């Protein structure tokens, strides 16, 4: 019978930390998306949505140390840069979106969220790290041998 090698505890801890980071970032992103009206609701005021997004960024930044791992250093650096860029755009959003029509305002909101694309690469890196077995070589072992 074949079994998987044990997972690296440091990789598992980094993954758990990344999940907390992602949850905080998702909540902030949802706050910003709440400004976009739908058929059932008019959309939240832009200033409140931006404030919610910035709060989500702050909460996500607080979780960065939780997924600190040498194998994720590059991904984490790219993520920090992405958070900074998204914050700059979000802070400028009320001024740049003032007076814009619906579609153009939504494009500006999308521009803010597009800055977070490196977070997807960080997630892939964290998942890949988690899949690496604790044993060197990454081979499966035969149970009982």
Where do the PLM segments sit?
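Long, low-complexity or tandemly repetitive, helically biased scaffold regions used
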Residues: 6, 10-145
């Amino acid at each position: 019978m074949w079994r998987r090698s044990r997972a690296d505890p440091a990789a598992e801890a980094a993954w758990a930390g990344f999940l907390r980071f992602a949850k905080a970032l998702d909540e902030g992103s949802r706050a910003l998306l709440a400004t976009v009206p739908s058929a059932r609701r008019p959309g939240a005021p832009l200033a409140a949505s931006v404030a919610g997004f910035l709060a989500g960024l702050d909460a996500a930044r607080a979780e960065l140390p939780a997924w600190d791992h040498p194998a994720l250093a590059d991904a984490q650096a790219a993520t920090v840069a992405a958070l900074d860029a998204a914050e700059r755009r979000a802070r400028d959003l009320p001024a740049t979106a003032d007076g814009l029509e619906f579609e153009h305002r939504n494009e500006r909101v999308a521009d803010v969220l597009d800055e977070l694309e490196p977070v997807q690469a960080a997630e892939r890196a964290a998942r890949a790290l988690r899949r690496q077995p604790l044993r060197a070589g990454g081979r499966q072992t035969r149970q009982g041998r």
